[in-house]
């Protein structure tokens, strides 16, 4: 009583406290970073190693395995995967959430150093690592085009200057440059000319390496001067290499230009990049796992004027893709939704109270509570994102509830003729415990979320804390500022009989009278209501089992990502043509704004594409509808497939799969994996619940298998090392020397000129110089025959792995897809040597599915404990919790009606309903208990009176929560696919709960009261006087 009086009778202090809360909130709002979702990225580090010319199997056994054994000992590694392809190995380390990325990076470097002695010689550089997830979509893509500069020169400028500058920007984790490779001097040998001159490929290699050296020469000095010695020991251009003498034949000099074409070219000619229809160099920028995407993009944009200033006029730098506009638009939509919710909630209050002064009170209380929450969000290190702003939108209905309960009770006393200050004090005292009970029990709902681990726990933590803080501030405001404003702003008045006969007042009176009549009938037919109550419990269970489920709603971010997978024996020239054909099909689609792509590198038969769609307001279709339309057109392209998926703000795992979801097969036997993977992939491709089924297992690449005759080799004076060196020199794009320049280092690359390697007959032209100096053709000691070979070898941990990726057809949920896959795996009878499990997002979905029911039960149990403590009763909390089944039925039916699967966002809605609908029961039970204690009423009379007396505030709070959630349902702008499931769940649950709990709660109250009396009689014993 004194606590409430302290604030009611000291209005200046109360107003200043509210002003301080508001000012702190405004400051916090200005300092809060902006993001699409809470920070939920796993710490990921990518280790790269290369050995030019080495086969995928050689890379896997000699490079990947030693590194994996060393890296696998690092603490906190959640998952380790690797992919080895021609001359390249990439290992992805995904760490636990609580692992510091910088500490993990130090451990990774130490593990690489430990494995260095086990790695093969000939590697051009030590393995390196980057703190970025290669499977994440770039946050920004820049393109460089030029009419006069070559692609190699553009690539050099991009990687040497632009990428270095961009990588220094805060938040940037990796800048991947694609579309070409660094400049190089390429030596294309003529095998027939070499044979005629009796020059081996090793001799050419050694001559070039010896002619291009960079060694310190020292200095000469006398008593007065010092001269630095400088020589022309380096050759830097193709023109300088051509006259190089590599051999003497009968005293005549054989120069490099006599046996080879020497050109200024690039290190790897099998690379191509395009933007729209133009050749381009792509700078794909990815952020650090812990970085904020908006701040990072803003930092890059702020740097662009400086970058453009350093670019020559012949180069055009453009932003091909930027993830931030759709994120900003989505957040703006949420902010507008929040403003609409506040306005609708205040309108509900006005319609019920029909007083401008009375409406002004919650109109002040709601913004103070919401704005004050921003200060706590800043102190907690949160961001303004879709989930935290959705929490505030939903909180609008909650925070006004507290003010409504206090305000309505004070207004009731004023209408009875009590003086304003006395009414404020008395009204607040009466409902103070009720408000505290409602708020604490609502906060209790979110305690299990705060303790939830893994990605879902990280994702929901900001939502739970933000909402809990808003409720806490609202509780303080409703017990301090609200009664003070009521006491000083409202006036005593007689019951507004005339006003109640008009408009909303007349409707409320009619509803209340009708409710009273129907409630009397219900209380006389309690068994029927009990059957209805039990029916809702059973219906909840059936609906939860039957409803389709998914992890997270499919987002329309306006960005698509596509992976090209061509025939495994395709040439680079043909693959480049496929890239151009696919880009043309996509560019012609009316919803597409921009398309960039590249192909080449270690996987000739693959490529990547990034598509930016037009803004949501400029296209009629969603991103998924655009994909469905393009899928039909792209399927007509022979010899290759393009798998498109919408970029999501949440992507789990480090695998660069060609679809959104993955199912991984593991085996200790590579042969067993290669036998069963095609069978499983074929069976899964036939499932209607899956689309775009593809696999990263590519073991049908064309290979030419050479079989050495070792006896003949020994007789001819040839060893295996010389033969292998011949093949590497001829066909491996071997980097044989380094050219040092002020800004970078470039390579001299040697191979047989591509003009002489157009078919297998090129092997017949190869020869080895034996120990006697004679040229021995390769065909003398080797036979060759075509075979199949893997284009890549993949590991997970230390086991051979193959990942089958898939998308979902429109109208199919992830739960339906996973059930179909599990059923198919059982039917196929896969042997124990091959193990299958979901990975990435599908794996997290499975884990979340297993914990959802536990989470809901934990929330209910927590609320029960809190209510039990507050009421000092085992029974009354059960009465209050009896409101939940009807809300659950309403929520699940609404999701079915809107064809929305049960997702993590819908789970949040269910958790919120646990907190919302019990408020009705709390108000009924509180007043019924008070009427029994102080009024001497029977339980039947008490609960009947409580229901009628609290009908108006129950309607007000329910409608306020409903109208607060309604804008989430009706939103259709950017990010609406995230907001709608939450709104649908809450609105559906509130409507059903309001229809049923007004009747079931009184019946349950009486049932437990009679049960309590029955047990108390049985346990009662006669008092014995001593």
Swiss-Prot record:
InterPro entries: AcrB_DN_DC_subdom (IPR027463), Acrflvin-R (IPR001036), Multidrug-R_MdtC (IPR023931). It comes from the Bacteria. GO terms for molecular function: xenobiotic transmembrane transporter activity. The chain crosses the membrane at residues 15-35, 333-353, 360-380, 387-407, 431-451, 463-483, 528-548, 853-873, 897-917, 953-973, 984-1004. Belongs to the resistance-nodulation-cell division (RND) (TC 2.A.6) family. MdtC subfamily. It is found in: Cell inner membrane. Part of a tripartite efflux system composed of MdtA, MdtB and MdtC. MdtC forms a heteromultimer with MdtB. It is a multi-pass membrane protein. This is Multidrug resistance protein MdtC. Its main location: membrane. Keywords: Cell inner membrane, Cell membrane, Membrane, Transmembrane, Transmembrane helix, Transport. One of its GO terms (cellular component) is plasma membrane. SUPFAM superfamilies: Multidrug efflux transporter AcrB pore domain, PN1, PN2, PC1 and PC2 subdomains, Multidrug efflux transporter AcrB TolC docking domain, DN and DC subdomains, Multidrug efflux transporter AcrB transmembrane domain.
């Amino acid at each position: 009583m004194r606590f409430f009086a302290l604030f009611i009778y000291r209005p200046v202090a109360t107003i200043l406290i509210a002003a301080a809360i508001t000012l702190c909130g405004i400051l916090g709002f200005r300092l809060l970073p902006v993001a699409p979702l809470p920070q939920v990225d796993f710490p990921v580090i990518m280790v790269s190693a290369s050995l030019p010319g080495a086969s995928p199997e050689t890379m896997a056994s000699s490079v990947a395995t030693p590194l994996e054994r060393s890296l696998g000992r690092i603490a906190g590694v959640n998952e380790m995967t690797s992919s080895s392809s021609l001359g390249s190995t990439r290992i992805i380390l995904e760490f636990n959430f609580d692992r510091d990325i910088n500490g993990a990076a130090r451990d990774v470097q130490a593990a690489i150093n430990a494995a260095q002695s086990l790695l093969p010689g000939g590697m051009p550089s030590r393995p390196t690592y980057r703190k970025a997830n290669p499977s994440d979509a770039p946050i920004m893509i820049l393109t460089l085009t030029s009419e006069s500069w070559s692609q190699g020169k553009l690539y050099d400028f991009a990687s040497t200057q632009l990428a270095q500058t961009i990588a220094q920007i805060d938040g940037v984790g990796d800048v991947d440059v694609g579309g070409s490779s660094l400049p190089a001097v390429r030596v294309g040998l003529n095998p027939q000319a070499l044979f005629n001159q009796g020059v081996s490929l090793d001799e050419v290699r050694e001559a070039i390496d010896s002619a291009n050296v960079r060694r310190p020469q020292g200095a000469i000095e006398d008593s007065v001067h010092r001269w630095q010695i400088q020589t022309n020991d380096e050759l830097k251009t193709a023109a300088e290499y051509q006259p190089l003498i590599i051999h003497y034949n009968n005293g005549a000099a054989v120069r490099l230009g006599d046996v080879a074409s020497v050109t200024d070219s690039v290190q790897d000619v099998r690379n191509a990049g395009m933007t729209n229809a133009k050749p381009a160099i792509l700078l794909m920028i990815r952020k650090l796992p812990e970085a904020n995407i908006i701040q990072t993009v803003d930092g890059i944009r702020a740097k662009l004027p400086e970058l453009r200033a350093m670019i020559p006029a012949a180069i055009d730098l453009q932003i091909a893709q930027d993830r931030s506009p759709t994120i900003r638009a989505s957040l703006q939509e949420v902010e507008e939704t929040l403003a609409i919710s506040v306005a609708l909630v205040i309108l509900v209050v006005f319609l019920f109270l029909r007083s401008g002064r009375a409406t002004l009170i919650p109109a002040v209380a709601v913004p103070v509570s919401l704005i004050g929450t921003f200060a706590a969000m800043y102190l907690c290190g949160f961001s303004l994102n879709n989930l935290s702003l959705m929490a505030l939108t939903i909180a609008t209905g909650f925070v006004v509830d507290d003010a409504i309960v206090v305000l309505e009770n004070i207004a009731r006393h004023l209408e009875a003729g009590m003086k304003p200050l006395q009414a404020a004090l008395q009204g607040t005292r009466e409902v103070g415990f009720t408000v505290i009970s409602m708020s604490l029990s609502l906060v209790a709902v979110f305690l299990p979320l705060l303790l939830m681990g893994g990605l879902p726990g990280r994702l929901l933590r900001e939502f739970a804390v933000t909402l809990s803080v808003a409720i806490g501030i609202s509780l303080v405001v409703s017990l301090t500022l609200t009664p003070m404003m009521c006491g000083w702003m409202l006036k005593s008045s007689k019951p507004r009989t005339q006003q109640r006969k008009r408009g909303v007042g007349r409707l409320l009176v009619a509803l209340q009278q009708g409710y009273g009549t129907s409630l009397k009938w219900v209380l006389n037919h309690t068994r029927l209501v009990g059957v209805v109550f039990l029916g809702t419990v059973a219906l909840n269970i059936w609906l939860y089992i039957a409803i389709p489920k998914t992890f997270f709603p499919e987002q329309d971010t306006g960005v698509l990502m596509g992976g090209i997978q061509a025939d495994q024996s395709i040439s680079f020239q043909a693959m480049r043509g496929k890239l151009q054909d696919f880009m043309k099909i996509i560019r012609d689609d009316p919803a597409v704004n921009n398309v960039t792509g590249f192909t080449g590198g270690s996987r000739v038969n693959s490529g990547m594409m990034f598509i930016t769609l037009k803004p949501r307001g400029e296209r009629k279709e969603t991103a998924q509808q655009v994909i469905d339309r393009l899928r039909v057109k792209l399927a007509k392209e022979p010899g290759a497939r393009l798998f498109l998926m919408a970029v999501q703000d949440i992507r789990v795992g480090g695998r660069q799969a060609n679809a959104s979801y993955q199912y991984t097969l593991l085996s200790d036997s590579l042969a067993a994996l290669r036998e069963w993977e095609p069978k499983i992939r074929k069976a899964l491709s036939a499932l209607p619940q899956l689309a775009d089924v593809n696999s990263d297992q590519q073991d049908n690449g064309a290979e030419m298998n050479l079989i050495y005759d070792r006896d003949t080799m020994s007789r001819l004076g040839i060893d295996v090392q010389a033969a292998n060196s011949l093949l590497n020199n001829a066909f491996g794009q071997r980097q044989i020397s380094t050219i040092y320049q002020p800004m970078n280092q470039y390579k001299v690359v040697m191979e047989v000129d591509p003009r002489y390697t157009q078919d297998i007959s090129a092997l017949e032209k190869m020869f080895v110089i034996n120990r006697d100096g004679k040229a021995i053709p390769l065909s003398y000691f080797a036979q060759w025959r075509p075979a199949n070979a893997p284009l890549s070898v993949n590991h997970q941990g230390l086991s051979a792995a193959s990942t089958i990726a898939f998308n979902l057809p429109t109208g199919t949920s992830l739960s339906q897809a996973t059930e179909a896959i599990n059923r198919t795996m059982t039917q196929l009878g896969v042997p124990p040597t091959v193990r299958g499990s979901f990975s990435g997002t599908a794996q997290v979905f499975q884990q979340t599915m297993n914990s959802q029911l536990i989470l809901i039960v934990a929330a209910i149990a927590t609320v029960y404990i809190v209510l039990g403590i507050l009421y000092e009763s085992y029974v009354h909390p059960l009465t209050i919790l009896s409101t939940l089944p009807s809300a659950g039925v309403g929520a699940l039916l609404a999701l079915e009606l809107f064809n929305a699967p049960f997702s993590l966002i819908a789970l949040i809605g269910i958790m919120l309903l646990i907190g919302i609908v019990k408020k009705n029961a709390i108000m009924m039970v509180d007043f019924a208990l008070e009427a029994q204690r102080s009024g001497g009423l029977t339980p039947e009379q008490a609960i009947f009176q409580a229901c009628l007396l609290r009908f108006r505030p129950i309607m007000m709070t329910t409608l306020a929560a409903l109208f607060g959630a309604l804008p989430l349902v009706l939103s259709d702008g950017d990010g609406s696919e995230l907001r709608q499931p939450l709104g649908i769940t809450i609105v559906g649950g509130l409507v059903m709960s309001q229809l049923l709990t007004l009747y079931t709660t009184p019946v349950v109250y009486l049932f437990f009261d009679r049960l309590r009396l029955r047990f108390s009689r049985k346990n009662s014993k006669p008092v014995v006087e001593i």
